[in-house]
Curated annotation (Swiss-Prot):
HAMAP family: CcmE (MF_01959). SUPFAM superfamilies: Heme chaperone CcmE. Heme binds at residues 121, 125. It comes from Ehrlichia canis (strain Jake). This is Cytochrome c-type biogenesis protein CcmE. InterPro entries: CcmE (IPR004329), CcmE-like_sf (IPR036127), NA-bd_OB-fold (IPR012340). Belongs to the CcmE/CycJ family. Residues 1-7 are cytoplasmic. Residues 29-133 are periplasmic. It is found in: Cell inner membrane. Heme chaperone required for the biogenesis of c-type cytochromes. Transiently binds heme delivered by CcmC and transfers the heme to apo-cytochromes in a process facilitated by CcmF and CcmH.
Length: 133
């Protein structure tokens, strides 16, 4: 092979390897992105909620938190629609009525059975002595 052909072959192989690795990385990133749907989107029926776990995000409605023996239920809203969430487990420390949460789980008979609750926090950090009391 001539030197020119070897160089061309090297460049082509390098682009193929680089392109393949970019496709693999982007595919893995796409499968790990954690979007969430609003209660309005879920209740509109435009999302297939029966197949896999989905994430629903919204604000916990004040006064809706109920604790049973080993279950917790509450309603989340996006200020248009609301969904009842049922959860079994320990709630995160930042969870409270009126706070924003993301629940991961499945819709079953009109209510959302969560297997994970993530509490969203305020983006403004304030040390303890500066927080409102």
């Amino acid at each position: 092979m001539k030197r020119k052909h070897k160089r061309l072959l090297f460049i082509i192989v390098t682009f193929i390897i680089f392109g393949s690795s970019v496709v693999i990385v982007l595919n893995k990133l796409r499968s790990n992105i954690s979007f969430f749907f609003t209660p309005t989107e879920v209740l509109s029926g435009s999302i297939n909620v029966s197949s896999n776990d989905i994430r629903i995000g919204g604000m916990v409605i004040s006064g809706s938190l109920k604790r049973y023996d080993n279950l917790i239920s509450f309603f989340i809203t996006d200020l248009e629609s609301q969904i009842k969430v049922v959860y079994q487990g320990i709630l995160p420390p930042l969870f409270s009525e009126g706070s924003w949460v993301v629940a991961k789980g499945k819709m079953v008979n009109g209510e959302f059975n969560a297997n994970e609750i993530l509490a969203k926090h305020d983006e403004n950090y304030k040390p303890g002595k500066y927080r409102a009391k």
